[in-house]
Amino acid sequence: LSFWLIPLSITNIPRVIRNKNLKIFLGSVSNKMSNAAVANITTALKILHKLEWDFQIPKDVNTNTWYIAMSNHQSWADIFILLAAGHKKIPLLKFFMKKELQWIPIIYLVHKTVDMPFLKRHSKAQIEANPELKKVDYETAKKAAKRFSRNPATAFSFAEGTRFTPKKHAAQDSPYSNLLKPKIGALAIALSGMPQVNTLIDFTVVYSSEKRSTWDFLCGDLNKAKVFAKT
């Protein structure tokens, strides 16, 4: 991944030039580089961890269409597994991520070079105290959706807004057995700014292991997983 950040960053320098056709071209190049990075990392993980990932993706999707997508969220590994699941089947997933994650250099660079937005998640109490906060997130997501419209993309958000844990599930008193209460604000905004979209892809990630940490993923403990998708 670090190797691909260098050419991605160089490719995106000319984006400061206000030329629509140039931005479309550079966006296409960035997406191709990102897909190549996903393929390379998947191959490396297959060699290192003997992956047993089963991806069940609808046959009626393609890489030349715009989509909105969502999924359950259990681990940091979800992000890469979903990227691998969608590779060469749908356009590159564009994740809406928590703004706090922008302080991690590699995440910041990846998101900026492939037009993935950071959103500040405000609590209901914060928005009630300051309604302007809702407008800030709305404008950020709307700008991202506008950029997505340049090239085929899959605007993606974890419906729960955070990773599932038994503790969070109990605290929310969620009506769902294996899900937290959904938060679909980012997807709703993205949809309003992407008139090309007419299909929602609903992903479900299932792991064989009870382990969920990033370290577990790197050690190969999440090498058995299934991804189901439906439209």
How would you name each of these model-derived features?
Residues T42-L45, L82, H111, A190:
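Structural element of the ATP-grasp superfamily
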Residues S9-A37, T63-N130:
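Catalytic core of membrane glycerolipid acyltransferases/transacylases, capturing the structured
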Residues N40-Y67:
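A short, well-structured juxtamembrane/interface segment
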